[in-house]
């Protein structure tokens, strides 16, 4: 299986899982892309107005760094007067045994750590 193809399959499976969790949190999952092609794989938006930004990556330091960079750029563009700040920025990965928070505040969470 080509790595890019596997990445698309993994992203689809993650979105499915995120939708299940979002439903339990009274929320929805959306994809975001702006006119400059800055995108976010998943925006978890709750009915209370809170939201989190999620990039999905297979793993590896370079991919996690790219995802975190994208999240920080997108968060910097948000009009916090209208939308508020994101509750969290997360890179969801395929590999790893535990979740952690980077120095820049971005969460790195292996898919196996998503639970009730």
Would you name each region that the model predicts?
Residues 1-116:
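A cross-kingdom feature that marks ATP-driven nucleic-acid transaction machinery
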């Amino acid at each position: 299986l080509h790595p890019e193809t596997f990445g698309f399959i993994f992203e689809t499976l993650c979105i499915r899982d995120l939708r299940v969790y979002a439903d339990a949190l009274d929320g929805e999952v959306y994809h975001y892309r702006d006119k400059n092609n800055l995108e976010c794989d998943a925006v978890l938006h709750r009915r209370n107005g809170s939201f989190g930004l999620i990039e999905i990556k297979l793993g590896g330091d370079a991919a996690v760094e790219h995802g975190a960079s994208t999240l920080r750029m997108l968060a910097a563009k948000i009009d916090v007067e209208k939308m508020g700040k994101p509750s969290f920025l997360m890179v969801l990965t395929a590999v790893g045994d535990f979740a952690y928070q980077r120095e820049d505040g971005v969460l790195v969470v292996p898919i196996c750590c998503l639970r009730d």
